[in-house]
Amino acid sequence: MPLFIIALDGHLGLFYGFLLAFIGAYVIVAGVSFMFLYLVRPASVAHLKIQQQMPSRKEVLHEIGWSSLTLLVWAVMAVILIYFIDRGLTQMYSGIESLGVTYFVFSILFLVISHDAYFYWVHRLMHDSDFAYKYIHSIHHESKNPTPFAIFSFGPIEAVLMGLYVYLIVFLVPINIYALAALFVFDTTANLFGHMGYELIPKKVTKSRIGRMFNTSVIHDLHHSGQQYNYSLYFRFWDKFMKTANQDNEKVWEEFHARNEK
């Protein structure tokens, strides 16, 4: 019998709970952002749209539909994870005081850095392989002009790959549930900025010494419009180290800000 059926048996309440929580987070984060940036669209931010044309209704519905399927997949994966935790098969622990606050804080930093590395290599492999791109990753790239609704717009296999990182970590490293929650919040926020279609972070921030370490909306938007290079998620390190940064990053970024400073 498939593991997900065994895990769901007697845990349907948990499944629906996770599903509602994921949907709620998606509606609040993506829905509210879309409403503000694409429906209300105040003059104070309208000029910050990276691609001047607006996405079609078909593109938006595509993003919502596939994101909904991703949330369903993740709810099933969350229940399976609970199944493993209940049987003591993971290194998940409760109570921050168990291993101390210092460990808890550093575990969050570890999650962010290791997840960034995991995402880069999985993402790059899905582009380097024509087969993987066509059958796994191409759904996400149908968003040529992404909106906030694209943050979880994956096919089912890619949704599993994106969620698989959590499984790998909790079997290897002691992790508190609140540290995972912090990663989810950080990841969702980073994804939102990468796919919102607007560059809202001021130039003086993104051009600062610290700001240059992080991805920007313009950089990831270039990835969606060109499909090559700029594979990183949070930080720009992997693209720079592996020489997969788009050579036009700085040029396009400067042109964008020059256009908006007139």
Kindly label every feature range from the protein language model.
Residues 14, 49-71, 95-105:
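Interfacial transmembrane-helix boundary/kink motif in multi-pass membrane proteins
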Residues 21-41, 74-78, 111-122, 190:
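Hydrophobic alpha-helical membrane-embedded segments
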Residues 32-61, 85-96:
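Membrane-helix interface linkers and caps
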Residues 62-79, 151-159:
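Select subsegments of transmembrane alpha-helices in polytopic membrane proteins
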Residues 71-90, 161-173:
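Alpha-helical transmembrane segments and their membrane-interface junctions
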Residues 76-114:
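Juxtamembrane helix-loop-helix connectors linking adjacent transmembrane helices
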